[in-house]
Amino acid sequence: MKENQTTIDTAPSLKGRAEGESKRPVVAIVCGGDSSEHDVSIRSAQGIYSFIDKERFEVYIVELNGLIWEAHLDGDKRAKVSREDFSFKVGRRTVLPDFAYITIHGTPGENGILQGYFDLIHMPYSTSDVLVESMTFNKFTLNQYLKGFGVSVSESLIVRKGNEDLVTDAEITEHIGLPCFVKPNAGGSSFGVTKVKTLEQLRPAIRLAMEESDEVMVEAFMPGTELTCGCYKTAAGEHVFPVTEVVTHNEFFDYDAKYNGSVDEITPARISDDLRDRVQALTSAIYDILGCSGIIRIDYIVTKVTGEDGHERDRINMLEINTTPGMTATSFIPQQVRAAGLDIKDVLTEIIEDKL
């Protein structure tokens, strides 16, 4: 067993099927990847494996780590996965998955690279296509695109590695202001994110973010109520989940808050029915604008603004879109599925069978 390798006992029985038993479609839960979110992705894969109906599907976890692609078998056993067709050996049997359930957070599973590979080998997968994945992974590009459809987003600037001096501190403070957030333009789980309160913190924060991405987004701070809402659509219909309210005990919803319990996640959110309906409607609309597929989750922050009539109202600002959202038992999506009165096993079955 390799050093720091996570052990997951996920192999189906290798005793074979009874004579005459129909073949179950083979589902590969694809996890790992090449970003700081590798281990988070493995936890999501464990969650999905526990949720999937294994009487209906034959399920394996496939971990990607650079050019090392391995299927998890019994105990610590691993099988090399062919990059030609994504097949692998289980004993003397060659297993060729019928479907890829992608749960890589970050590259290459959340930015279109892996989707392009599966398109080339004609294997259906759980997420949106190459264009949607690449756009939603690039926070700055996504913001500019959705602004054209009237979606409210924060003011932001982009800083690129090698051209850091093209955006001056004066420009940032004038157009964005302080405090502000400095974050990798392509990344997740709040790795490399800093809330900058003083000018002296700005450049160190940019350097930290560039450890995760060659592009850094400097984003205006918006005080308000943080919400998140999941959604998926298939030929059978649309499901927009109940809204979750996120109350962090940290400076912001950082890695510690997300994964170490320093947050209250309240589902359904303590908001008015009108605001709930607006958030759910916006989530559905963005799903359609982008042409998403599979389960997505959109994060928002609701701020107070004063209208021309002098009355205060809620403005819903889109923060980011997660196209491979976390799927552990305590992640937002399973919480929202339960709150909607649905069974996560049935949800995953619907998503998989919609693509087969």
Describe the function of each predicted region:
Residues 59, 124-125, 153, 180, ...:
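Hydrophobic beta-strand scaffold residues
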Residues 197-281, 301-317:
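Phosphate-binding site of ATP-dependent enzymes
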Residues 74-80, 116-117, 252-260, 323:
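Short, flexible, mixed-charge acidic loops at enzyme active sites
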Residues 2-4, 20-31, 35, 135-224:
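Active-site nucleotide/adenylate-binding loops and adjacent lid/helix of ATP-dependent enzymes
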Residues 1-131, 135-137, 141, 160-171:
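ATP-binding N-terminal substructure of ATP-dependent carboxylate-amine bond-forming enzymes
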Residues 2-9, 19-25, 273-356:
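ATP-dependent carboxylate activation and anion-phosphoryl transfer catalytic cores
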